[in-house]
Amino acid sequence: DVDKLTADKMRAAYWEKYGTSLAGLMQNHQIDPEDFLNVVHDIDFSVLSKDLNLSNSLNKLPGRKLVYTNGTAPYAREVLKYRGLTDVFDEIYGIEDAAYVPKPFPEAFEIVFSKANIIHRKSAMFEDEVRNLEVPFKLGLKTILVSDVQSNKKYVNYSVKCLSDFLRQITSNSFN
């Protein structure tokens, strides 16, 4: 057992070094990933609200739509359910689908993109963590950072604050 301050420091250090705090716990403390994720993902999803605008905007995009998260696929499904986005996505991939290797590591993308049959030059990656866009960019995907903190990194094609607004812009043909 560790105190909260020590736990927070460990979490931040593991996230920085290993991509997720889970990966650091697995590496340094032999934590079972399924046990850990079952505990941290046991949350109240009812605080989330449906987002009809986002659903409509996503549905206007051509092609397959996938979710790839450093959380688990079941966790992502719950989030999507409470956000009213269940029927928008064709496939959902979680960290378990990458053998618990997290984004931003190249192996994680290689595993998931291979399973999903991603055609790199015809795909885009939307991500809220800038460091998770470098590998997809190098693979030839268009990269979109969705965050209040904007980025001018060379591997970020677009940096936007609001995903719904961005999608509305590109699907209305007013996109430059």
Positions of predicted regions on the chain:
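Residue-level signal for alpha-helical context at structural boundaries
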Residues: 28-29, 43-44, 54-55, 94, ...
